């Protein structure tokens, strides 16, 4: 039996009007609820620490898009974007709403996603946990006042119920956990997981559908702006140095993770930052460390009885996190938007040791590497035997992009052309040999290369084309040894270098086969050795 939208809207309205539905609580009020309900503990830094239980990261296999007539032909269905039928979704949705109706307390936040007024998404977030509501308050864009919040008529609603467990046989899910996005009903339904990042990435997935439909590029990247208004974007997967390299005391942060690029320039989708906290120290990352204060949330960190935090302890997970409003960082752009990018940096951590530390890409090469989204991960064993494994994540964030990858790549190519953007591929990985033989490229040298690229000093520099990949390598960069610029020179055994490089090229080509005929033009012009 299907359930109608009228009933659904009525149930939501009823929930919002319940006397025990706490609307737009202040940070202090939410802190009190978190501590009174034993949802978290106060740390000596002023932040609260919460545990997410057994789910310490996203659950990509439990994420679905509702297959609805007006939207289904646009979505790139597959392992990442899984379909669920509308009736199955609605039955579960109403079970969740009935579950919430029986709860003693609910927490409601209204705000926005997207700092560009023309495409800003108006949000309502309904939580059963107070700390999740503080997370929403930290991560999304906050209204100026409670009065403004009351006037928000949402374009999308997040309903998050971590303690509601689905029954896969009855509810049509794959496990007790579910993240379901419906564009028709304008709902993100999350249950069975306390990992708060599902809310943030759920809205990012929605924006990655809606923005390109308006010819606006959506991007999984960090962004900053220099004193002269020059804008740089940093794309890169986990472990490539995206956060470290974009946190620059001489440049203001636009945002650390999710952005749009429209006719006016670049804008942040979020109102906060969700930083990795493992091994965090004031010495290494002072901006992030100082942002962890009253109002911030720590996830899954180890807190002693005296409130001290051990950021090096990974007993619960390597994926410890800090969620804080962007204004916890001093060096930011307000509002979080800027002009068109001058420079784009693609970061890769090549553990094979063969990709140049920096190379300049033309538009076709940029589209190729954007679609490839390459880095490498290290597979460790107890005996210490490690071999690098290539990792490809389309658009540098495959789990969050519901449309076909070429939609995003074509938009990127058009914008690079239109605004004459310089694009560089920067390898923060190994040189002189693969992992275990060579050494990690010095962060000092990487910073120097990135700074030279962003400043425009490499725009008209002298380049040489390397014979293996066909990439344009700068002949010299100030304060960087010439010997590391062309990777073959750093290897003592040149034949081993060539064999390793050829192996990586073949892996790129094999990965690109999954895109089919739609990308033949990019493969022909942008792939290696062209």
From Swiss-Prot:
Binds 1 Mn(2+) ion per subunit. The gene is pckA. Keywords: ATP-binding, Cytoplasm, Decarboxylase, Gluconeogenesis, Lyase, Manganese, Metal-binding, Nucleotide-binding. GO terms for molecular function: ATP binding; metal ion binding; phosphoenolpyruvate carboxykinase (ATP) activity. Belongs to the phosphoenolpyruvate carboxykinase (ATP) family. This is Phosphoenolpyruvate carboxykinase (ATP). It comes from the Bacteria. Its main location: cytoplasm. GO terms for cellular component: cytosol. ATP binds at residues 201, 220, 236-244, 285, 321, 440-441, 446.
């Amino acid at each position: 039996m299907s359930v109608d939208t009228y009933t659904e809207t009525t149930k939501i309205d009823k929930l919002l009007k319940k006397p025990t539905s706490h609307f737009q609580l202040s940070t202090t009020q939410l802190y009190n609820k978190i501590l009174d309900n034993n949802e978290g503990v106060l740390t000596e830094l002023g932040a609260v620490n919460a545990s997410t239980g057994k789910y310490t990261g996203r659950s990509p296999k439990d994420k679905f898009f509702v297959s609805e007539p007006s939207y289904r032909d646009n979505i790139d269905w597959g392992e990442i974007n899984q379909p669920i039928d509308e009736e199955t979704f609605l039955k579960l949705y109403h079970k969740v709403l009935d579950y919430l109706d029986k709860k003693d307390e609910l927490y409601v936040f209204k705000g926005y996603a997207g700092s560009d007024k023309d495409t800003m998404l108006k949000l309502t977030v309904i939580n059963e946990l107070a700390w999740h509501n503080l997370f929403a308050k930290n991560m999304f864009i906050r209204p100026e006042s409670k009065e403004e919040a009351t006037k928000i008529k949402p374009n999308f609603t997040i309903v998050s119920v971590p303690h509601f467990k689905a029954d896969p046989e009855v509810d049509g899910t794959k496990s007790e956990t579910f993240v379901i996005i419906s564009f028709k009903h304008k709902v993100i339904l999350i249950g069975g997981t306390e990992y708060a990042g599902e809310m943030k990435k759920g809205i990012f997935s929605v924006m990655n559908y809606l923005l390109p439909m308006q010819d606006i590029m959506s991007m999984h990247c960090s962004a900053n702006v220099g004193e002269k208004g020059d804008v740089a974007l940093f794309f890169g997967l986990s472990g490539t140095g995206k956060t470290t390299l974009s946190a620059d005391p001489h440049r203001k942060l636009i945002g650390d993770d999710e952005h749009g690029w429209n006719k006016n320039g670049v804008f942040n989708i979020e109102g906060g930052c969700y930083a990795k906290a493992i091994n965090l120290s004031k010495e290494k990352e002072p901006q992030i460390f100082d942002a962890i204060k009253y109002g911030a949330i720590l996830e899954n960190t180890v807190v002693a009885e005296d409130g001290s935090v051990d950021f090096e302890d990974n007993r619960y997970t390597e994926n410890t996190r800090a969620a804080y409003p962007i204004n916890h960082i001093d060096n930011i752009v307000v509002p979080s938007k800027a002009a068109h990018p001058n420079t784009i940096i693609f970061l890769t951590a090549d553990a094979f040791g063969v990709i140049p530390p920096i190379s300049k890409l033309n538009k076709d090469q940029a589209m190729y590497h954007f679609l490839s989204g390459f880095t490498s991960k290290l597979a460790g064993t107890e005996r210490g035997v490690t071999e690098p494994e290539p990792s490809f994540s389309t658009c540098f964030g495959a789990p969050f992009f519901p449309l076909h990858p070429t939609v995003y790549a074509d938009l990127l190519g058009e914008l690079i052309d239109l605004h004459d953007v310089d694009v560089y591929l920067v390898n923060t990985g190994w040189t002189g040999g693969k992992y275990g033989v060579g050494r990690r490229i010095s962060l000092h040298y990487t910073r120097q290369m990135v700074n030279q690229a962003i400043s425009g000093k490499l725009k008209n520099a002298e380049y040489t084309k390397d014979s293996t990949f066909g990439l344009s390598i700068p002949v010299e960069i100030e304060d960087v040894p010439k010997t590391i610029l062309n990777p073959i020179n750093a290897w003592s055994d040149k034949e081993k270098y060539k064999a390793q490089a050829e192996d990586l090229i073949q892996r790129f080509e094999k990965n690109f086969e999954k895109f089919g005929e739609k990308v033949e033009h990019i493969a022909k012009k942008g792939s290696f050795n062209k």
